[in-house]
Amino acid sequence: MQNTRRCISLICVTRQPPSLRATYGAVAAARCLHRAPPQSSRKKHETNVSTLFKPVQVQANVDCEDVGSELVGKLEKSELLKILNKFTQRRETKSLCSENGLDSYLQQQAFGSFRRYCIEAENLPVDLHIIFSDIMQGAGHIDDIFPYFLRHAKTVFPHLDCMDDLKKISDLRQPANWYTNARALTRKIVFHSGPTNSGKTYHAMERYLSAKTGVYCGPLKLLATEVYNKANERGTPCDLVTGEERKFGISDNSPANHVACTVEMTSVNTPYEVAVIDEIQQIRDPQRGWAWTRAFLGLIADEVHVCGEAGALELLQKICETTGETVEVRRYDRLTELTVEDSALGSLDNVMPGDCIVCFSKHDIYTVSREIEARGKEVAVIYGGLPPGTKLAQAAKFNDPANSCKVMVATDAIGMGLNLSIRRIIFYSLVKPTMNERGEREIDTISVSSALQIAGRAGRFRTQWEHGYVTAFKSEDLQTLQRILAQTPEPLKQAGLHPTADQIELYAYHLPNSSLSNLMDIFVNLCTVDDSLYFMCNIEDFKFLAEMIQHVPLPLRARYVFCCAPINRKMPFVCSMFLKIARQYSRNEPITFEFIKSNCGWPFKLPKTILDLVHLESVFDVMDLYRFMDLFPEAGNVREAQKELDEIIQQGVFQITRLLKNTEASQEGETPNYSMRRVTHVKEPRLPSASRGRLTDRLLAQGLLTPGMLSELRKEWDAQQVGQAAAASTSSKESQESPPDDSDDEDSYPGSYKKTRRKRRK
């Protein structure tokens, strides 16, 4: 009877796929290890990488008849469980698992799944049933189970069969080789190096306009639109390409030889005579740096002119060493004088015509604007969340010598994209929430590069204010500001990279049961990058959108496009509409202008409060989302509606002080300490030293802050927080209200302040 079982078992084994039969050789080798130490296994994957691979549910055996029981009898579940437990605890089993790519985490998951499969299945596959029966009868060896376990493990974790392929797909060590057409050329690389207001971009643009064909790649829609307008005004037909629209310089569907585009929309398949890449220092940006890297490596152009700060030169030269190209450097000096004043502003009473007060949060924008207008001075307001038309209107109002508006309050959104006639830049604060390369929010002093970029906006060439001035609002910030502006920007060390849609599609082919967010995590953790030149850009915003629409059935390519949408995830209404649009698209239902109108509250009304204004800004972003997707039929109608909405928002911003008053009036008796909290912030602004992290360490190292002073500041901070908490308890509705976002949409992160405060109390 035992010989019969052995013959049947052997027949079953020979009918297995070659990969499973080959595993028996490994099992045989393992039997020689009973009394010997295990052989060294291959290098294990990091635990955090293994945990990213989600187990696949294994389907039960589909055979209706229990052939195994008919041949060798039924299996006792209790005996079967003993065999499985013994199998999983064997040193030789674990050694074989390691040799086949299963680390401790994957072993645990696979053992558990295999055990449940064997115990809970009504009918086991006949060959596995016979193997278990032989072991129970003493005619088989427990290691005979391993080939079946390994087959099960590879079903649960499909990546075990394709790990080498996954690593090859995510090998990003030589991104220059991705662009074969660009590598086929011997490109002339010209770096126009200089500070703000030095004329570097002007000289690059002159070469662009004189070329037969050209492309301008800018960081903002405003800059691309400005180049588009100037080129056409000078008689050089030029098209405009941004994420939301395409405009033709000649006629519809008749492309011009020149293109002005945002850097993400740059074509790396079209040949040009001249390409201009503006603000090249953004190649280090944790979120968008990949777009500059792609443009610099991939543009098919005889001449590539890059403009930016001197700190980018060394990195560009190193990258060009990998492409066999050299960099010609043209240096420019600032065209106008810039003086750092010896005294701080001290009070808003000292604001003068031509002043621009730079804040790093919307809350500061609102409160400073109101305080200045309370002194009888009209204010222009610019921050990142405003539509482009509103920004331009506010800039024109401020620049017009005949206009009564002589003061501007803005965020660092003015650092790029707007021509402003500013006499003096005043830093209201030197502390800004930022995001590091790990995607963590932290509060730190503004960088040298950012400070120079903003300060350089003062004293523009050929304006009424050719001599620029810079100072701080608070006297305690002035010395720090002077020290920052006396430095040169640190050399850039790395350029950003990002997974492409093609790479993620290949990952999805190998891991069909993984979500898009999960695929991105696996890619980032498995990828290999040349750390001396490149880094992987932060993908948290992409993953946030991917997880939001994970339950919506969409093709992978469409899902990827949706997740690339430039959405501010701090705006609940925008996120809600994003989800609605994705659902509508997945059902193959038309996403029309009527759909947008019905969900966005058309027709629009003039805002009466700041909350109304913030909502209208969100609606504008939703319309941008509609046009960005390039998947929907009525983009033209939505664009016309955006123009109308832009004008309404402009009127709201022109009357921002009245909106603030209305907001406070509507909240009286409901959230009284909300206004109090805002006023307290203005009267007693946070000191830079109150933040934890690198800033505190830097001040301690420089001797500007002693441990004793730090201890006293912490006590004072804690006392203030206790006082605010006590005041907050007097309002029963405080927790039910949702006050306006306290940061600039594009440039700061309010959650960082709140998070830091909580840490401080601890």
Curated annotation (Swiss-Prot):
GO molecular function: ATP binding; ATP hydrolysis activity; DNA binding; DNA helicase activity; RNA helicase activity
Binding site for ATP: G194, P195, T196, N197, S198, G199, K200, T201
GO annotation (BP), single: mitochondrial RNA 3'-end processing
Gene3D superfamilies: 1.10.1740.140, 1.20.272.40, 1.20.58.1080, P-loop containing nucleotide triphosphate hydrolases (3.40.50.300)
Swiss-Prot/TrEMBL keywords: ATP-binding, Helicase, Hydrolase, Mitochondrion, Nucleotide-binding, Transit peptide
Subcellular location: Mitochondrion
Compositional bias segments (type: Polar residues): 721-730
Catalytic activity: ATP + H2O = ADP + phosphate + H(+)
Database matches in Pfam families: DEXQc_Suv3, Helicase_C, Suv3_C_1, Suv3_N
Annotated ranges, domain Helicase C-terminal: 331-508
Claim: Zinc is one of the keywords in the record: no
Record: transit peptide: 1-36
Class of the enzyme per the UniProt entry, highest EC level: hydrolase
EC number: 3.6.4.13
GO cellular component: mitochondrial degradosome; mitochondrial matrix
Compositionally biased region (Acidic residues): 739-748
Keyword Membrane: no
Limits of the Helicase ATP-binding domain: 181-321
Cofactors required: Mg(2+); Mn(2+)
UniProt-annotated stretches for the region Disordered: 716-762
Task of the protein: Major helicase player in mitochondrial RNA metabolism and maintenance. Likely component of the mitochondrial degradosome (mtEXO) complex, that degrades 3' overhang double-stranded RNA with a 3'-to-5' directionality in an ATP-dependent manner. ATPase and ATP-dependent multisubstrate helicase, able to unwind double-stranded (ds) DNA and RNA, and RNA/DNA heteroduplexes in the 5'-to-3' direction. Regulates mRNA stability and is required for the correct processing and maturation of mitochondrial transcripts.
Family: Belongs to the helicase family.
Name the record gives this protein: ATP-dependent RNA helicase SUV3 homolog, mitochondrial
